[in-house]
Design a protein with these regions (language model features):
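Membrane-spanning beta-strand positions in outer-membrane beta-barrel proteins
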Residues: 55-57, 100, 134, 183-185, ...
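Short, well-structured alpha-helical patches and their helix-loop capping segments
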Residues: 160-167, 198-202, 290
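Outer membrane beta-barrel
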Residues: 51-66, 78-193, 212-213
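Short strand-coil-strand connectors
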Residues: 178-182, 213-215, 244-246, 322-324
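Exposed loop/turn and edge beta-strand positions of beta-sandwich/beta-sheet ligand-binding modules
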Residues: 85, 119, 131, 169, ...
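Cleavable N-terminal export/targeting peptides
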Residues: 1-52, 364-371
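Loop-centered beta-sheet repeat module
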Residues: 187-233
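Outer-membrane beta-barrel pore domains
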Residues: 61-77, 113, 124, 128, ...
Length: 371
């Protein structure tokens, strides 16, 4: 069924690409739609905020630590030592029982002159039409499947080459349908391309996403079409699976990537797996494995370059010093990568070993509700 949906998805957009005039009309229509949605939300906020009790939640997240990073057993002084890696501040809440909002800002993110929103992960408004349908607009997470992709960045110690080069936070709009039992959510979303540039801000990406929650098994699946150059697309099939048994969990992701006329499966793909086991309430173990490969001869994949084949693995311990609280922890881990990375600016290197000691905190600073 997933591959049938994917085929329909691809064929539809190839029809648009064959008719440049129609495609331009589509782009113009989406721009006007985004502007209309934003205007309607802005007009609605002052009126609806008075109809119910608004809430505000303020949260703070950070990760600092010490790294020892070596390639061919030679220490890399520019990336080793004490580091402040993440500093995030978020505000979320509701204006009433139908309209909610969320904003997350990276305080330590370098901002480009041509994009003042670079440090903003997301800022959007969500409208709950009924128990099944939600509409959202603003800067959002582009809905690509997979549990590595879905994790908060401060929770990732070892990541795939794909994860290191993707830009998941983009302006767009989405519609989500939740089933009656609440176990599945289906989302359709249109965003800026994950590869948009200052010279091409009007490139787009199209996403269909399924999030399932079935107790021992959870899923984050998607099919995606991402414009990597004007009128040229790369497609993703992302299959994220999570299995929970007692104190153990396994996240297993597979992603296949293909541009037009490429061999469909396994030429350009990634596999990510993470295993977690809670030995006791205040001590946990984790292990991680990633594999990225691109055996195509095109430049369509901007995340895993043609000619790349990289394997990485590692593991460590997590200590929770505050009893019955997982929002503060200390982590010690080690990872190793090997293979060929054809991206000169890539994150993973051949024969690279990293030892990481990290302190993480997710602090809930404020929760307020109007009386």
């Amino acid at each position: 069924m997933l591959f049938f949906i994917y085929s329909v998805f691809i064929n539809t957009f190839e029809m648009y690409l064959q008719n440049k005039k129609s495609f331009n009309y589509l782009l113009l229509f989406m721009k006007q739609t985004f502007a209309l949605l934003a205007g309607l939300f802005c007009m609605a906020l002052p009126t609806l905020a008075d109809d119910d009790k608004p809430t505000i939640n303020v949260d703070f997240m950070t990760r600092v630590g010490y790294l020892n990073d070596r390639v061919d057993n030679q220490i890399r002084h520019d990336v080793s030592g004490f580091k402040g890696e993440y500093l995030l501040f978020s505000i979320s809440g509701q204006l009433n029982d139908r309209i909610s909002y969320a904003w997350r800002q990276r305080i330590n993110q370098k901002k480009e002159v041509n994009d003042r929103f670079d440090g903003t992960d997301w800022v959007y408004v969500d409208y709950k039409a009924n128990d099944h349908w939600n509409l959202a607009a603003g800067k959002q997470v582009a809905m690509v499947g997979g549990y590595e992709y879905d994790r908060c960045p401060i929770d990732i110690y070892l990541s795939s080459e794909f994860w290191n080069n993707i830009s998941p936070f983009q302006f767009g709009a989405s519609a989500t349908y939740t089933t009656t039992n609440g176990k599945s959510r289906f989302t359709g979303q249109v965003t800026q391309s994950l590869f948009n540039t200052p010279a091409n801000r009007d490139m787009f990406a199209y996403h269909l996403h399924w999030a399932g929650s079935y107790g021992w098994f959870n899923s984050l699946y998607s099919v995606n079409m991402v414009e990597y150059e004007p009128s040229r697309f790369i497609s993703y099939i992302a299959l994220g699976n999570k299995f929970n048994v007692g104190n153990a969990s396994l996240e297993l992701d597979f992603m296949n990537r293909a541009a037009s006329h490429q061999t469909f499966l396994l030429k350009d793909c990634s596999v990510m797996a993470r295993f977690d086991y809670k030995l006791m309430p205040q001590l946990g173990l984790y292990g991680k494995f990633t594999y990225d490969v691109n055996r195509t001869d095109t430049e369509a994949d901007k995340c895993v370059h043609s000619g790349t084949e990289m394997t990485a693995y590692g593991g460590g311990v997590e200590v929770y010093p505050i009893k019955n609280r997982n929002d503060v922890r200390v982590s010690l881990g080690m990872s190793h990568s090997q293979g060929t990375n054809s991206n000169p600016s890539g994150a993973l290197n051949d024969n690279q070993t990293t030892v990481r000691l990290s302190f993480l905190a997710k602090l809930h600073l404020l929760s307020w509700k109007s009386k």
